[in-house]
Amino acid sequence: TSLCAERQKYIVQNLETALYLTVNNPSGYADVTLXAFDFGXNQLFXLIP
């Protein structure tokens, strides 16, 4: 369970980073955000037994 929690925390931090970059670098927001969400989704699927 702790491993899952760590992964989920990492996903949240990754998405927060993407949001920060989106706000501070609007011209490149699409690629950064999509990559972050793709990474997050892959991590979430890894949590499914």
UniProtKB/Swiss-Prot annotation:
Keywords: Lectin
One GO MF term: carbohydrate binding
Cysteine pairs bridged by disulfides in the record: none
Expression across tissues: Stored in spherulous cells in the sponge tissue.
Subunit organization: Homodimer.
Functional summary from the UniProt entry: Possesses D-galactose binding specificity.
The protein's name: Lectin-2
UniProt organism field: Axinella polypoides
